Amino acid sequence: MARRRKGRPINGVILLDKPTGISSNDALQKVKRIFFAEKAGHTGALDPLATGMLPICLGEATKFSQFLLDSDKRYRVIAKLGERTDTSDSDGEVVETRPVDVNLEKLEACIDTFRGESDQVPSMFSALKYQGKPLYEYARKGIEVPRESRKITVYEIILHRFEGDEVEMEVHCSKGTYIRTIVDDLGEMLGCGAHVTMLRRTGVAKYPYEKMVTLEQLNELLEQAHRDEVAPKELLDPLLLPMDTAVEDLPEVNLKAELTNLVQHGMPVQVLGAPEGTPIRMTSGEDKLFIGVAEVNDDGKVAPKRLVVFRDEE
């Protein structure tokens, strides 16, 4: 007897405005339950303290979440000068207090050093793993383990406000950039220490800020559906963005029906002018139905790598 799946095969991306105080995984599970989705995955964790854009992939969209993990991010951050914490944010314990002797000129000069490419050593309080365990598990036990530095790029860092011991900045950066680490490093450069008191992710890839929805809004729609005696999906599903928005920056190859059929059975196909050396977004027919991601193989053919499996709700 076939195992009955729990949840429905709904596909798409919801742009959640994550609230402060909960983990990204907790937020993911709440969204999964609200949509009664069979599968769900987020696209890069936010700290419990942080709020803002957390794209959550549902169903077949989870196959393409890696492309969002690898995408650029934008943040708004407020830092408090004069105090350093063990987590580099206000959720941690203050480990050092120093007087703040910083003027605008010195602050701007220090901020300028973060622009461009650099090597960043991740915080011990991060989800990166060492010998199979997240770093934060070691950190909570007071154990320091070696971490390799990673190449990051800060495309833009803008100082919006400097008042007393508070600094507010906007950062546009590459994947894997820890804003807490930037703030901690900035505090050390200034000689007074610093930690994050507010962090909000305002952008992931090219997703529009105004498309974000809160857990409260989703729960209200769920309650409204129950009051109106309609299926929750009638009110919730229109909020979903198409799953190919996760790969919209990839070059497109449009396939006719015959080639589509071959690709959907895992067969490489010959496509004139297909771009090499990059993942390819495959669409089918005049409607340009998204069917998956491919790469050009050594034979010069478009070889499917991740395919969308289309299933109807039971």
Curated annotation (Swiss-Prot):
Keywords: Isomerase, tRNA processing
This protein's record includes keyword tRNA processing: yes
InterPro entries in the cross-refs: PsdUridine_synth_cat_dom_sf (IPR020103), PsdUridine_synth_N (IPR002501), PUA-like_sf (IPR015947), PUA_sf (IPR036974), tRNA_psdUridine_synth_TruB (IPR014780), tRNA_sdUridine_synth_fam1_C (IPR015240), TruB_C (IPR032819)
Its EC number(s): 5.4.99.25
First-level EC class: isomerase
Record GO terms (molecular function): RNA binding; tRNA pseudouridine(55) synthase activity
Residue intervals passing through the bilayer: none
Keyword tRNA processing tagged: yes
Reactions catalysed, as given in the entry: uridine(55) in tRNA = pseudouridine(55) in tRNA
A single GO BP: tRNA pseudouridine synthesis
Residues annotated as catalytic: 47
Alphabetical list of Pfam families matching this protein: TruB-C_2, TruB_C_2, TruB_N
Similarity field: Belongs to the pseudouridine synthase TruB family. Type 1 subfamily.
Function: Responsible for synthesis of pseudouridine from uracil-55 in the psi GC loop of transfer RNAs.
UniProt xrefs under PANTHER family: PSEUDOURIDYLATE SYNTHASE TRUB1, TRNA-PSEUDOURIDINE SYNTHASE
Full protein name: tRNA pseudouridine synthase B
